[in-house]
């Protein structure tokens, strides 16, 4: 695929993002209304797309995706753990700051850019399962783990943590992650396919597609709005998070894919899924803990801008 072909492929995607940026930057949306757009994508449109995609996939086809699932777990959760250890023991961050920094370096905005970018390359139906698996990894494993570690760091500083409260907090974090539509919808759908070999009737697919088909455009617009309403204040931690997200993590995923022996198309999917900009959700978790709020918000914007350069390069090298 030539550079011109790639730019033509990505042009509609970046056009909608830029349109969203104008809407956010010039006041058509504020933080509250932008959250409403994001909620439409993450709690309704994308879960509907996942259900329709997974429940029209055969059990054998689903099982063929297992190596890709393993790669995504290692490439996302494993990367988080590596950065966490580096921050904690080399840069001497406290545990909470280490967890926040690592989460923002590891969590991609797959929910907003996965369908438009990967769908343009492989077709929307072909990428439903990889994106759904990423949703489970992020919402049911990564976010709860990061929240638990950050909370332990806060509690240990205050010397208030007890065994009971730790396990209660752990259970609540995992349960919250599993209850998120981005995790619950694909997880339940996968169980229906793997255990019961269930296939959704055509009428059900059409009903879900009425909402799921809106995912691409609305999701990209939401990314642009989110970037547009944020202010940028460059710092070394912000630049570091952005570079880890769009350059280092995709490179690590390439090595993981080679080690596991993924075929070329799955390698491209795995690399692109982690190469997307940092996640606004991860930046919100930083705000929750009142740690590196400015840095993570800036990193989100910077990584989104850098992805305009990195994504075409990655597609040219792998697709």
From Swiss-Prot:
Pfam family, one: Mem_trans
Keywords, sorted A to Z: Cell membrane, Membrane, Transmembrane, Transmembrane helix, Transport
Cell location: Cell membrane
Cellular component GO terms, alphabetical: plasma membrane
Gene3D superfamilies: 1.20.1530.20
Database matches in InterPro entries: Auxin_eff_plant (IPR014024), Mem_transp_PIN-like (IPR004776), Na+/solute_symporter_sf (IPR038770)
Primary location: membrane
One GO BP: transmembrane transport
Entry's transmembrane regions: 3-23, 36-56, 66-86, 108-128, 129-149, 181-201, 209-229, 238-258, 267-287, 299-319
Bilayer disposition of the protein: Multi-pass membrane protein
Family: Belongs to the auxin efflux carrier (TC 2.A.69) family.
Protein name as catalogued: Uncharacterized transporter YwkB
Organism this protein belongs to: Bacillus subtilis (strain 168)
Phylogenetic classification of the source organism: Bacteria, Bacillati, Bacillota, Bacilli, Bacillales
């Amino acid at each position: 695929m030539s550079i011109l072909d790639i730019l033509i492929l990505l042009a509609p995607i970046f056009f909608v993002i830029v349109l969203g940026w104008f809407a956010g930057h010039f006041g058509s949306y504020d933080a509250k209304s932008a959250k409403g757009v994001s909620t439409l994508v993450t709690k309704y449109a994308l879960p509907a797309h996942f259900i329709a995609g997974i429940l029209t996939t055969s059990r054998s086809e689903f099982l063929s995706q297992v190596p890709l699932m393993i790669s995504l777990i290692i490439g996302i959760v494993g990367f988080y753990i590596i950065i966490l250890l580096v921050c904690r023991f080399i840069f001497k961050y406290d545990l909470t700051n280490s967890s926040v920094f690592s989460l923002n370096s590891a969590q991609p905005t797959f929910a907003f850019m996965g369908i438009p970018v990967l769908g343009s390359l492989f077709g929307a139906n072909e990428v439903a399962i990889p994106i759904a698996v990423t949703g489970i990894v992020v919402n049911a494993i990564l976010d709860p783990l990061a929240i638990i570690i950050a909370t332990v760091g806060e509690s240990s500083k205050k010397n208030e943590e007890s065994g009971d409260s730790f396990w209660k907090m752990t259970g609540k974090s995992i349960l919250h992650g599993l209850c998120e539509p981005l995790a619950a919808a694909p997880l339940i759908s996968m169980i229906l396919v793997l255990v019961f070999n269930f296939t959704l009737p055509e009428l059900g697919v059409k009903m879900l597609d009425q909402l799921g088909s809106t995912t691409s455009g609305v999701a990209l617009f939401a990314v642009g709005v989110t970037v547009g309403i944020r202010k940028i204040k460059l710092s070394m931690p912000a630049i570091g998070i952005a570079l880890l997200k769009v350059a280092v993590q995709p490179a690590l995923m390439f090595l993981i894919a080679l080690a596991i022996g993924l075929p070329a198309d799955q390698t491209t999917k795995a690399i692109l899924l982690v190469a997307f900009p940092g996640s606004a959700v991860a930046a919100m978790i930083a705000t929750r803990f009142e740690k590196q709020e400015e840095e993570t918000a800036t990193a989100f914007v910077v990584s989104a801008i850098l992805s305009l350069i990195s994504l075409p390069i990655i597609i040219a090298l792998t697709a």
